Every structure is written in structure tokens, then in C-alpha cells.
Amino acid sequence: MGRPRAFDEEQAVRAAAELFAVRGYEGTSVDDLVTGLGVHRGSLYKVFGSKRGLYLAALRRHLDEEVLPLAAALREADGLGALLAQAVAAFDGGPAAGLLLSAAVERAGGDPEVGALVGEGLAALDGAVEQVGGNGSGTAGVLAATVLGLRLRARAGAGGPSADAVLAFAERVG
């Protein structure tokens, strides 16, 4: 009988999600993970198999605990302006909030499993926007892309329209 696990797997996945969201997959070394998670390298490999295995677990957790619940909540919004305000506020909720976007930019094109998870998250967000705003004029897709674009610009430290300006625009067209 083996020794009991010396770390909390869920906490390790949560901490890894934050590291990957802030530093990206390529910018996060196994040493960064060992230090940031407070686990031994052997334990990390035993539980997750590889850095990629931990990344997939972190992205799955991010979808299940943050993105999909957000999409469900957005479906209840009273109009596109309210939906956009809620989405912008949610994506400003901390470092792990950027993991979906980071995965989309950095890994989805070259890793089919990451691409499938990113696609699942984006489809859920798009579906919420379409349900609230309809898709007749294409406004729903534009607003979904706008929310993600705001988050991307914030990550890059770039200027651009403020969330308030986007909200004002959404009110005019919604």
C-alpha cells in the first residue's frame, strides 16, 4: 500500500491555473510549478503525468468552475448591456480568469485537446450572448468577441476602449 498523497490535488490544480494564466504554458516551467504548488516533482508527474497533463486539468477546472457557471449566469441577464457588464466584471476577477484566453492564444491551434476545451468554453459564452441578444444582426457575436478582446488588451497592458465605453455602445445597439 502506497503512502497517502502529500498534497491537495484540487488546490494544486487551482494554483497551477493561476500560474498558467499569468505566465502562459511555455513561460511556466516544471520548476515553477514545483515551487508554486509546493509539491515534489515526482508527485506532480505521478498524479498528472506531465506538465501538459496538469495544464489540461487546470483548464478543465477553469471551465467547470468559472467559465461554464459564468455562461449559465449570463443567460439570465436582462439585455445585452447587463450581460456585457456582468461579463466584463467576471473577467476582471483575478489571474485565473485569463486562462481561457491564454489557452486560446497560446495552445489551442497546436494542441487538439486544448483546442476542444477552448472551443467548449467559447461556445458556452457565445451561446449565452446569443440567447440574450438574439443573433439576427450579428451583435451577439461581436459582443462576445469584445469581452474577450477587452480581457486580451488588459493582459497585454494595451490601451483601448474602457469597459464603460463598451457598455455605452452595447446600450446604444442593444
Spans of model-derived segments:
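Hydrophobic alpha-helical connector segments
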Residues: 57, 68-98, 143
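Short alpha-helical scaffolding segments that buttress acidic/His motifs in well-ordered protein cores
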Residues: 87, 100-105, 143-150
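Amphipathic alpha-helical segments used for helix-helix packing
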Residues: 85, 92-122
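N-terminal intrinsically disordered/low-complexity leader segments
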Residues: 1-7, 171
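An amphipathic alpha-helix signature
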Residues: 13, 81, 85, 123-130, ...
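Helix-turn-helix
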Residues: 10-11, 15-58
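Hydrophobic/aromatic-rich alpha-helical bundle segments in the mid-to-C-terminal region
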Residues: 112-123, 132-174
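Short, basic, alpha-helical segments at the C-terminal edge of helix-turn-helix-like DNA-binding modules
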Residues: 60-66
